[in-house]
Design a protein with these regions (language model features):
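Terminal low-complexity/charged segments
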Residues: 1-206
């Protein structure tokens, strides 16, 4: 067991939950969401611990709908060559939000954005919390949540609108845009623009 766990318990008491040693030998300690920022600052700044490098931030959702979403922070002390994982549980019936650690480790910026993008977890105090893998206007959910369909979820009509909006003079084939069956959903002006395209033909019944 990583000795930082006993030091955390002595300092933060009940804010520190269970701890275990994973199969790879690393210690995982669970921390209450409200005390996360204080614990992380202590781990970074306290002599003899000094976790100065945030390796990763990720999230896990299990098949059991009753289990909370888990946020996992991978910390590394470069000076001591020691690793520690800090885990926070977020019950799904509560707000999926907790404090950002960007103020402690600048590298958390993109890591937290990815968790937000894929799982919908909000990080309070993040300087620029927006999607990072999906496009910013994507509004079809969070792709790594268990309720997200394996086939994905997107609007083909919206895909075409964005493509034509970015380059209205371009010609697109139906193979490129994959919207043949969504043609009827498009507004009339866009249908006309697509009909005038030089590449590909659109099946329509008018």
């Amino acid at each position: 067991m990583n000795p930082s766990v006993d030091a955390l318990r002595a300092t933060f008491g009940n804010a520190i939950g269970r701890a275990l040693v994973a199969r790879d030998g690393e210690t995982i300690v669970t921390v209450g969401r409200d005390g996360l920022l204080g614990v992380m600052r202590w781990l970074r700044d306290t002599a003899g611990h000094s976790y100065d490098y945030l390796v990763d931030v990720t999230a896990v959702e299990y098949r059991d709908a009753e289990r909370p979403i888990e946020l996992v922070y991978f910390l590394r002390s470069l000076e001591r060559r020691a690793d520690l994982r800090v885990k926070v549980e977020l019950p799904k019936e509560q707000e999926l939000a907790l404090d950002s650690v960007v103020g402690l480790w600048a590298g958390a910026d993109w890591l937290e954005r990815e968790v937000y993008d894929m799982f919908g977890v909000t990080f309070r105090g993040h300087p620029d919390l927006r999607r990072i893998l999906m496009w910013e206007t994507y509004a079809e959910g969070y792709p790594l949540r268990k309720d997200f369909p394996l086939r994905g979820r997107f609007s083909r009509a919206e895909q075409v609108r964005q493509a034509l909006g970015a380059n209205p003079e371009a010609h697109y084939s139906m193979e490129e845009l994959s919207i043949a069956e969504a043609f009827a959903e498009l507004p009339e002006d866009m249908k006309q623009r697509l009909r005038q395209g030089e590449r590909g033909k659109i099946p329509f019944s008018e």
